[in-house]
Amino acid sequence: MRPIIFVLSLIIMSSKLASAETIQIDFTSDDSYSVEVAKIDVGDTIDWLPKNEGHNVEFLGGPDFNSLPERSDLNAFYSVTFNLTGVYLYHCTPHGNMGMLGLVIVGNDFHNLKDIEGIELSRVAKSVLKRLIRIAKSNS
């Protein structure tokens, strides 16, 4: 009986892995991300590609502040697999105050949106965040 359960567990795990997707987001030449609002499922991965120099990814908030991904290096490939549902806010460290922000919505779950809206940002970045939230909600 145990071998059957083990085999079934492997099949279920591999089918979940097989259905996971990877989204690619470029650093653009106009100080933005090529995808500003990414809606993904649990287990999906986002790869940020350094198509233009001087950019990175730094997470400012998410469903569990204590387990946010670390800040990426400038001009470097960066990859994150998302395992918790909720809203994640990230920016480019050098250009965040100018509005280079992105949102990741995992599992179409907005439970922590108020926390994201409460993050201290520059006036320009706050305006961009409001626009990104409108986009995210309109596609939910």
Predicted regions and their residues:
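Sec-dependent N-terminal signal peptides
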Residues: 4-14
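Extracytoplasmic copper-binding redox domains, predominantly the cupredoxin/blue-copper superfamily
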Residues: 18-140
